[in-house]
Amino acid sequence: MAFNVTILTIFPEMFPGFLNYSLAGKALEKKIWNLEVINIRSFAKDKHSTVDDVPYGGGAGMVMRSDVVGDAVDSMLSVHKNTKFIYMTPSGTKFNQNIARELLEFPHITILCGRFEGIDQRIIDAYTPYELSIGDYILSGGEPAAMVVLDACIRLLPGVVNNTDSITEESFNYGGGVLEYPQYTRPEQWKGYKVPEVLLSGNHKKISDWRQKQSHVITKKRRPELLSGEINDKFT
């Protein structure tokens, strides 16, 4: 069964964007995943296609209107009643590899991409989307964040990556969720740097032990919370 995605955005021309290239693009051509893009501006109430307004209580920026966004959501739900509805927001649960895997369990997901100062809170209250963040920083809109989420999901789909070992041995999958070990290829020497001898030995046990040790060292140095389990890795 294909992985089906609907995007709600005021910039439909941004999609599929970089998802139209490389592995994700080929998978889209093969219909391993399907993309539908809905233009929120189509549900605007005036001739200027206005989707935002000033915030009640004052403050900087503009807020996306609940009536406009709500009509777009209602239109989507009339077709995709069992979709998993997601809203990209910096205040959401931080996205990770486990969430990417769990998203694939849903036959259809919908991602709402905000702009300006975000969406009217009543959209969240009325539809209770799963609020998702890709990190502790601010983008101009939810579209790039949505593409990041989708790229992480798509590459896990069967038939997208030819060599499945490429997935199982990379960061957050390898060795119980730690960071990946260093990789080397030809030439054996470059600018005075040599490939570690163990990787040239042909001894698979020693190579495996070296890689596990390197993964542990790198993870302990850069992401110790992955070793301690102090990370929210569940999609709820």
Swiss-Prot record:
Cross-referenced HAMAP family: TrmD
Protein name in the entry: tRNA (guanine-N(1)-)-methyltransferase
Signal peptide: none
Residues engaged in binding S-adenosyl-L-methionine: G114, I134, G135, D136, Y137, I138, L139
Reported function: Specifically methylates guanosine-37 in various tRNAs.
Chief subcellular location: cytoplasm
Reaction it catalyzes: guanosine(37) in tRNA + S-adenosyl-L-methionine = N(1)-methylguanosine(37) in tRNA + S-adenosyl-L-homocysteine + H(+)
E.C. no: 2.1.1.228
Subcellular localization, as worded in the UniProt entry: Cytoplasm
This protein's encoding gene: trmD
